[in-house]
């Protein structure tokens, strides 16, 4: 708690420090008397201040001591609370561990009880099994006696167990042979089924191949007919080509003769090759166009020229 020193002194000395108006009877006091009076008042005030200061110091020390005691008590209280909280937590942890251990012990006890019941039931079953085996042993004792009599009559075996082992060996061999025979029969059946399946597939393939052969033969006949048609057409084309070649030769020969006749009569000088039929035809066409134009001009002028004879070709 914070202590206000100013408020404390103000409250303590408010009455003593107030300036009092002098009474009228003081008007007759001498200055020396007044000075002594003021000094006396100052001494009283200083004594009062000293007393109040000592009281304040004592109260302040008491308050500090009280504060220290309160802080110490607070620390002790905090420590006690911490220890109490720790105690509660440890106690709760111990309680949880105890509960967990009790639960585990209950589970273990239940498990042991179930195990005991199971062992008891198993023991009961074993006792029943033992009784059954004893009954079977008593029932099969006649076979033991029979085997003992057989052993006495043979010199091959010395004990009954040897005879039983020999019998078990023969039975195992028989079982192996029977198993092998069964496997061979199954293998033979599978091979027979595979053979039948293969024969069926082969017959189907042969039938399919025969159908394909028939189709291919028909296709071959059609191809041969088409080939014969194309051969006939090719012969016709060759004959037509020969005729066209012969006709083309005649045309080229006639063109050359006509070109040479025109060139000779019109005295044309050209460097056209005898093989260039197209150039010859172009030259002949130009000459015919020129002659036609000249003829038209002469006809307009009233003079009809004598048309030169143009050689004809077959």
Curated annotation (Swiss-Prot):
Q: Does the keyword Lipid metabolism apply?
A: no
Gene Ontology cellular-component terms listed:
cytoskeleton
Q: Which controlled-vocabulary keywords does the entry list?
A: Coiled coil
Which Pfam families did the record assign?
A: DUF4200 (PF13863)
- Name the InterPro entries for this protein: CFAP_domain-containing, DUF4200
The protein's superkingdom reads: Eukaryota
- Among its keywords, does the record have Transmembrane? no
From the UniProt record, list the coiled-coil ranges.
34-133, 175-231
Similarity comment: family membership:
Belongs to the CFAP73 family.
- The name of this protein is Coiled-coil domain-containing protein 42 like-2
What organism does this protein naturally occur in? Xenopus tropicalis (Western clawed frog)
Q: What is the lineage of its organism?
A: Eukaryota, Metazoa, Chordata, Craniata, Vertebrata
């Amino acid at each position: 708690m914070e202590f206000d020193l100013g408020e404390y002194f103000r409250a303590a000395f408010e009455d003593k420090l107030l300036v009092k108006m002098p009474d009228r009877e003081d008007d007759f006091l001498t200055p020396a008397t007044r000075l002594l009076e003021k000094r006396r008042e100052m001494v009283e005030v200083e004594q009062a201040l000293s007393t109040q200061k000592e009281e304040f110091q004592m109260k302040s020390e008491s308050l500090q001591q009280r504060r220290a005691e309160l802080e110490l008590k607070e620390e002790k209280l905090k420590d006690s609370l911490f220890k109490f909280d720790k105690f509660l937590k440890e106690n709760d942890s111990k309680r949880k561990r105890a509960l967990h251990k009790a639960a585990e012990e209950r589970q273990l006890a239940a498990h042991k009880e179930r195990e005991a019941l199971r062992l008891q039931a198993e023991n009961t079953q074993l006792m029943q099994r033992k009784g059954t085996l004893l009954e079977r042993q008593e029932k099969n004792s006649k076979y033991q006696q029979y085997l003992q009599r057989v052993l006495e009559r043979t010199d091959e075996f010395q004990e009954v167990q040897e005879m039983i082992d020999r019998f078990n060996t023969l039975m195992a061999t028989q079982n192996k042979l029977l198993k092998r025979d069964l496997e061979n029969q199954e293998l033979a059946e599978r091979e027979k089924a595979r053979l039948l399946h293969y024969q069926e597939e082969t017959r189907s393939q042969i039938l399919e191949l025969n159908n394909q052969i028939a189709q291919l033969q028909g296709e071959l006949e059609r191809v041969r007919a088409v080939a014969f048609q194309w051969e006939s057409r090719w012969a016709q084309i060759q004959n037509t080509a020969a005729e066209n070649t012969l006709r083309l030769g005649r045309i080229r020969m006639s063109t050359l003769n006509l070109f040479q006749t025109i060139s000779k009569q019109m005295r044309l000088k050209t460097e056209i090759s005898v093989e260039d039929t197209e150039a010859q035809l172009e030259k002949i066409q130009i000459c015919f166009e020129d002659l036609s134009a000249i003829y038209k001009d002469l006809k307009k002028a009233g003079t009809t020229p004598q048309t030169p004879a143009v050689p004809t070709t077959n």
